[in-house]
């Protein structure tokens, strides 16, 4: 048995190829069934995200295993091997173990240290569990990888610093306000960045969130998800008065929030401070707003400066995380190698126990026939000793005849003679 990881990701393939090898969630069970029908495959997990598609497998080692698995992948997705060969990577045993641990820990992600990948790995694992597609070795490997990811999160600062614009905006808000539970947040726009911001804020217990957008329909689905109120941009002036934090990201070509609007807002708020984060390009908030008293305005460039600093911190933390992965992958491989002896140990113990039972039965029968107990015990121990040392003795003699000093030393170690 050998462990394999086969796949493509954002480093090795463009999106035009990655999208052609995606396994859709609703057909993943069918894909796993097809994969396990391959004669060499004992167990499998399929991880498929926007940035990577990977197969984690336990297989019966064969000379042409790589060709067989690539052929299956291509046939399933109606591709030719030459379409993917230049983009595929292949890891075996220790390299496969390390790769999964790095993936689960966010060390192989487009955004270094991002936490979402762990949930995606867990989801892929759960799908294989439901379909009974796991071998015992794969199950142990994935459980171990989850533990490693947790260690990396708790023992390093890999996830402590914001490295996306959305996350940086939320981190800034958390740094300025002691508690987000008591503030009102106004989100302007309803695109992907605002979606991420809204989810981050909800995770940090923001109770009052308002989403302002040109159309209510686009914002409503997000508002329902995060428990926010929806308004149109026409209502923005009125809502600004209530907002402690404003985060804006629209596709507008002109500023939406101007200096005059904010002067009226501050007057109505009696100059209570406001945090404003403009992550739109072109800008949604006139730069002059940042000169007003009690307004703390940050642009996307300000956030990028924060991100670059934090990315450097994450890279430093990644060195420590890689050390954890190296240690844990070595430990797992030691466990895996030990499993190859389990069946032999079980057979050896069963053989010894069978011999014990046989000799005990003969000794008891002899005693019941009136034979001297001491003589029976002496005979029992003599026969038991001879039977137990017979096979090792033959192996020692054969190793000596062959002049195999290495084997002789292994046998001496096994018998506890050194």
UniProtKB/Swiss-Prot annotation:
Superkingdom: Bacteria
Q: Which residues cross the membrane?
A: none
In what pathway does it function? Porphyrin-containing compound metabolism; protoporphyrin-IX biosynthesis; 5-aminolevulinate from L-glutamyl-tRNA(Glu): step 1/2
- Gene3D superfamilies membership: Glutamyl-tRNA reductase, N-terminal domain, NAD(P)-binding Rossmann-like Domain
Q: Which UniProt keywords apply?
A: NADP, Oxidoreductase, Porphyrin biosynthesis
Any one GO MF term held by the record is: NADP binding
Q: Where is this site: Important for activity?
A: 99
Q: Describe its function.
A: Catalyzes the NADPH-dependent reduction of glutamyl-tRNA(Glu) to glutamate 1-semialdehyde (GSA).
- Other remarks on this protein: During catalysis, the active site Cys acts as a nucleophile attacking the alpha-carbonyl group of tRNA-bound glutamate with the formation of a thioester intermediate between enzyme and glutamate, and the concomitant release of tRNA(Glu). The thioester intermediate is finally reduced by direct hydride transfer from NADPH, to form the product GSA.
Its family remark reads: Belongs to the glutamyl-tRNA reductase family.
This chain belongs to which protein, by name?
Glutamyl-tRNA reductase
Q: Which organism is it from?
A: Pectobacterium carotovorum subsp. carotovorum (strain PC1)
Instruction: Give the encoding gene's name.
Output: hemA
């Amino acid at each position: 048995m050998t462990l394999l990881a086969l796949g493509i990701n954002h480093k090795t393939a463009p999106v035009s190829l990655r999208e052609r090898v995606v396994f859709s969630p609703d057909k993943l069970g069918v894909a796993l069934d097809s994969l396990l029908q391959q004669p060499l495959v004992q167990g499998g997990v399929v991880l498929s995200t926007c940035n990577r598609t990977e197969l984690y497998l336990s297989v019966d080692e064969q000379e042409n295993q790589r060709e067989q698995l690539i052929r299956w992948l291509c046939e399933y997705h109606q591709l030719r091997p030459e379409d993917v060969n230049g983009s595929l990577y292949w890891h075996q045993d220790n390299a496969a173990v390390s790769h999964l641990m790095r993936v689960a820990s966010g060390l192989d992600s487009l955004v270094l240290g991002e936490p979402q990948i762990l949930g995606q790995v867990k989801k892929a694992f759960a799908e294989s569990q439901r379909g009974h597609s796991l071998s015992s070795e794969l199950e142990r490997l994935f459980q171990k990888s989850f533990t490693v990811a947790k260690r990396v999160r708790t023992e390093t600062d890999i996830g402590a610093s914001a490295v996306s614009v959305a996350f940086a905006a939320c981190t800034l808000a958390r740094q300025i306000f002691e508690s987000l539970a008591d503030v009102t947040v106004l989100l302007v726009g309803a695109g992907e960045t605002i979606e991420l911001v809204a989810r981050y804020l909800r995770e940090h217990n923001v109770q009052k969130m308002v989403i302002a957008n040109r159309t209510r329909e686009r914002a409503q689905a997000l508002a329902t998800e995060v428990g926010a109120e929806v308004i149109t941009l026409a209502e923005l002036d009125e809502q600004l008065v209530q907002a402690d934090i404003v985060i804006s990201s629209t596709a507008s070509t002109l500023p939406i929030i101007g200096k005059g609007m904010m002067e009226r807002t501050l007057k109505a708020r009696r100059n209570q401070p406001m945090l404003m984060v403009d992550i739109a390009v072109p800008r949604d908030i006139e730069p002059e707003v940042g000169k007003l008293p009690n307004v703390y305005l940050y642009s996307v460039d300000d956030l990028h400066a924060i991100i670059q600093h934090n990315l450097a911190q994450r890279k430093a933390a990644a060195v420590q995380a890689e050390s954890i992965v190296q240690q844990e992958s070595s430990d797992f491989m030691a466990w895996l190698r030990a499993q190859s002896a389990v069946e032999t140990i079980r057979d050896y113990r069963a053989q010894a126990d069978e011999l014990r039972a046989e000799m005990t039965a003969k000794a008891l029968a002899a005693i019941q026939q009136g034979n001297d107990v001491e003589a029976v015990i002496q005979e029992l121990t003599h026969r038991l000793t001879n039977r137990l040392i017979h096979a090792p003795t033959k192996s020692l003699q054969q190793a000596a005849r062959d002049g195999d000093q290495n084997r002789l030393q292994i046998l001496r170690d096994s018998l506890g003679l050194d």
